[in-house]
Amino acid sequence: MRIRGCAIALWLMLFASFARADASAGEAIRMFLERETTGMPGRVSIELGVPDPQIRPAPCARIEPFLPGSARMWGRTSIGLRCADGAAWSTYLQVNIHVFAPVLVANRSLSAGQPLAEDDYRVEEIDLTLHPAGILQDAAYADKKELARMNAAGQPLRREHFRPRAVV
């Protein structure tokens, strides 16, 4: 996983009043993001948003990151930050989580009803967070299946694009 180091440094500069001028707040954020994104299906890259410079909460000895109730660590989301030692406050920080993984992409326009052949697709690394769920990462899923609908060239192949082949 890659968290843009300069983003954490910028965040700490802007929020120096949140915590004692230390790297422990940045380290807590980094460790939280690493823990929450472990096991994702690919290479993870995280961009931290820039905090609002007008927000100036009371000094805090220890910042504790948390995931808000409805948030998920996927795409553009937010993480919460609360003071765990000192004044009682919490705020939110925008994050953008990218998950890059190899997937099957159509080499050319594919017609409905045709089985998938090896020369119909290529493997390409894409950001899964920018696409709907169900993108194929393994061609074995398409065995004994045919395309249920047309698929344009350059588009990732998805599970719902396939149906079992008709047996006559």
Predicted regions and their residues:
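Bacterial N-terminal signal peptides
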Residues: 7-17
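Mature, extracytoplasmic segments of signal peptide-bearing proteins
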Residues: 2-3, 17-168
